[in-house]
């Protein structure tokens, strides 16, 4: 039976990759009248997002350590100490029964404080390669959830990524429909290649807000729909026969849940090259085609699109669905509400 009086602190901040999966869990927890509060950074996008969902937000001073200059590294111990004191104060005031960490700086500090306070610590890793924070916290966490198999060696349950996604039945298209997703800010290297496509297919290109007008003017193909954003991704996946995109954890999970075949171009400078490893999960299961950005050419891309057939697309789509984990939110929420 659920303990609806349980106080739960969710720790996630900085980027959408941490925030939106955590928010999916938080909104489900709220249905059970749980006492939910949020720990984030003072600089992350959570400051604009979380208050809109009627969740109390605590913020601490953000201190990133990877890729910083010497001066920043000298300041880091003092800033870390201050941030730790801020988190301790939050714990003493809220007295959480369980904390959920989604990775990133605030999750790291909060997770260590939870361990010191002997508070139940649950973590979730969204990528196939764990971030530094979760590598550390996995050793002390009460429970670890992972989106993909074999991310951690010990103490981990594969749940999938906690996203709210309701797939729509695929359309039956006569001509190949290619959906290109550039991410919220777009992807200039991908845009420069795909705008050269001059084959008889339908293209829907989500460019990001910075590139919509430029990309639209560069296309040779007249059957192109260019939009800065796509708000209804389920409809877009239903329209698409195949998607060309980066390999962020949420995108890969959506491809699985929507049973959509894909051409994946991992971001080459992603931390620990995690996008490559995310993409490899789909390609290893014959659910996607992996192309490194350095190898992407118009000739290669046109060759793939001209030679792929409906049966191959159907098989890739089926394979993607086979490795999907549609119950991640419920699985994690159930654990949070019944754990001691």
From Swiss-Prot:
Flavoprotein is among the record's keywords = no
Stored Pfam families: Glyco_tran_28_C, Glyco_transf_28
Which pathway? Answer: Cell wall biogenesis; peptidoglycan biosynthesis
Q: How does it sit in the membrane?
A: Peripheral membrane protein
For this protein, the record's Gene3D superfamilies field holds:
Glycogen Phosphorylase B
> According to its UniProt record, where is this protein located?
Cell inner membrane
Output the superkingdom of the source species: Bacteria
> Which molecular function GO terms apply here?
UDP-N-acetyl-D-glucosamine:N-acetylmuramoyl-L-alanyl-D-glutamyl-meso-2,6-diaminopimelyl-D-alanyl-D-alanine-diphosphoundecaprenol 4-beta-N-acetylglucosaminlytransferase activity; undecaprenyldiphospho-muramoylpentapeptide beta-N-acetylglucosaminyltransferase activity
Its EC number is 2.4.1.227
Q: From which residue to which does the signal peptide run?
A: none
Gene Ontology biological process terms in this record: carbohydrate metabolic process; cell division; cell wall organization; lipid glycosylation; peptidoglycan biosynthetic process; regulation of cell shape
Q: Which residues bind UDP-N-acetyl-alpha-D-glucosamine?
A: 15-17, 127, 184, 230, 275
Q: Which GO terms describe its cellular component?
A: plasma membrane
Q: Does the keyword RNA-binding apply?
A: no
- Give the function comment from the record: Cell wall formation. Catalyzes the transfer of a GlcNAc subunit on undecaprenyl-pyrophosphoryl-MurNAc-pentapeptide (lipid intermediate I) to form undecaprenyl-pyrophosphoryl-MurNAc-(pentapeptide)GlcNAc (lipid intermediate II).
Q: Which family is this protein grouped under?
A: Belongs to the glycosyltransferase 28 family. MurG subfamily.
Please name the PANTHER family in this protein's record: GLYCOSYLTRANSFERASE (PTHR21015:SF22), UDP-N-ACETYLGLUCOSAMINE--N-ACETYLMURAMYL-(PENTAPEPTIDE) PYROPHOSPHORYL-UNDECAPRENOL N-ACETYLGLUCOSAMINE TRANSFERASE 1 (PTHR21015)
HAMAP family, from UniProt?
MurG
- Protein name as annotated: UDP-N-acetylglucosamine--N-acetylmuramyl-(pentapeptide) pyrophosphoryl-undecaprenol N-acetylglucosamine transferase
Which species does the entry assign this protein to? Vesicomyosocius okutanii subsp. Calyptogena okutanii (strain HA)
Encoding gene per record: murG
